Amino acid sequence: MAADRCNINVGAPSNACQNPDRQKGVKGQDPCPLLGKHAGIWKFDENKPGQTQEAGGTRFATGLRQMPAITWHEGALYIVMHNRDQLDVFWPDTFTAKDNAERPAEPLYRAVQGSDFGWPYCFYDYPMKRFLTNPEYGGDGKDGARCATFTAPVAAFPAHWAPVDIKFYTGNQFPAKYRGGAFIAFHGSWNRAPLPQAGYNVTFQPMAGGKATGDFEVFADGFTGKSPLMNPGDAVARPDGIAQAPDGSLYIGESQKGKIWRVMYTGK
């Protein structure tokens, strides 16, 4: 975190800014009124009490639906976003259930002052690796003309994996390839039917200089206890947090039974 600055993430209480929300065929509000006090990151002076978003706070970035996975690394703020849901349910003439299972991406963003990441007007598509206009704003699953000014992600992960934490590895215990890269905990999906549910893992994204240097890899897996997993409630464990120990070990927490694992490298 920058000196004397506190960054606060404020998620959006909405799927795609419809009114009423999550209804078949309802267009999105344009402009979306939620962007005034939601769907973004605000910065505050940590030495001043009594601040609000309007008085003392400054909006740092916008266009982020939900972003519990947020961290500061090497002078920049990184976020992994929960993207929108249920494309097929609300727009069945445009998207199939399989479309919804594979899109949109859960994107990793690098935020700077004034960044706009596109929600609710656009989503970053995992199969196409580009922004598309949301159907609530006239999108047909192919067009992204409205999205030209939005900031593209550093990396993208499969649909509905539900990122909940991100930590950049700064230790020396693990092999050199992990240094400076990001570990991301995914809580796992609930709406990928008819495909099996997915996520429920910790991935590693190689990074250097604020950019991805390769594809992500699954670092820790097997939390569900069964495969395929069709019902999220049947998962034995769901990753929910990551921490790095002073000795360079990695701690992974889960939410089903409150377990914590310690991951150490022994050279074997």
Residue ranges and their predicted role:
Residues 241-268:
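Blade-level signature of beta-propeller repeat domains, shared across WD40, Kelch, NHL, RCC1
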